[in-house]
Curated annotation (Swiss-Prot):
Predominant localisation class: mitochondrion
Keyword Isomerase: no
Function statement: Mitochondrial transporter that imports/exports pyrimidine nucleotides into and from mitochondria. Transports preferentially cytosine and uracil (deoxy)nucleoside mono-, di-, and triphosphates by uniport and antiport mechanism.
Keyword set, alphabetical order: Membrane, Mitochondrion, Mitochondrion inner membrane, Repeat, Transmembrane, Transmembrane helix, Transport
Protein name (database record): Solute carrier family 25 member 36
Gene Ontology biological process: mitochondrial genome maintenance; pyrimidine nucleotide import into mitochondrion; regulation of mitochondrial membrane potential
InterPro entries (UniProt xref): Mit_carrier (IPR002067), Mitochondrial_sb/sol_carrier (IPR018108), Mt_carrier_dom_sf (IPR023395), SLC25A33/36-like (IPR049562)
Membrane-related topology note: Multi-pass membrane protein
Positions of Solcar repeats: 4-110, 118-205, 226-310
Gene transcribed to yield this protein: SLC25A36
Cellular compartments per GO CC: mitochondrial inner membrane; mitochondrion
Amino acid sequence: MSQRDTLVHLFAGGCGGTVGAILTCPLEVVKTRLQSSSVTLYISEVHLNTVNGASVNRVTRVSPGPLHCLKMILQKEGPRSLFRGLGPNLVGVAPSRAIYFAAYSNCKEKLNNIFNPDSTQVHMISAGVAGFTAITMTNPIWLVKTRLQLDARNRGEKRMSAFECVRKVYRSDGIKGFYRGMSASYAGISETVIHFVIYESIKRKLLEHKTASAMDSEDESAKEASDFVGMMMAAATSKTCATSIAYPHEVVRTRLREEGTKYRSFFQTLSLLVREEGYGSLYRGLTTHLVRQIPNTAIMMSTYEVVVYLLDG
């Protein structure tokens, strides 16, 4: 791959990630709050003892739904809070996606000379290498973004800035504090691999269908519109499947990035979540995550493909 091609994929990946992050930021904030332990509701219930008739007070842990969480944020913190962490998100998403797509494209090109071109092995290894590279280089940015999104303040209260967050993390945990949750992110590479394998498979089928069908009679703009919609559908379908399978790592990662020392490692957090909150806690925020990720991934992937097409064309 030439230097120009690498720069094209870097730029296209950055554009796709930035556009998707801006449009879906409010859903990202709601999802992060739902994944954390800070929004658990404690409902007091009075039960009558069947033996002596005395009343017994029991406290039940309940996870609020996406709409309830959204309502709480709007009531207590105001609409601006739905864009908390957007700064670090934009700072991180462009280089993260740029690094990811450049690493993916370079790795895929090299592996095509070793394995069958565009085979499942090629896409799996390329996606894994790209995910590992991007996670390692950008984890500190995502930790700051998560902390800012979990920083709930009432209307009128001074909000913590990204620089204040960085100083706070460094004072409490040092440099290693910026890499909390990275083990869960590495576990999430499985989601990335599943996503790209399915995406490339659907994309290949669409290209085969396009070649086989008699589309020569259609005008160029109609073909381009059809390609764009096809890529968006491929991205949305593949991301839905991958997220549904590998979602628990997202919850574990958010808990690890919370302040405090209760959650220490990936497997310790996983077992603690199941023991204290049940298996359902591993899928807290999944609905909101899917509602956000499907359009975000569709926008990101289609923007990436369009930018590459325009720059290469």
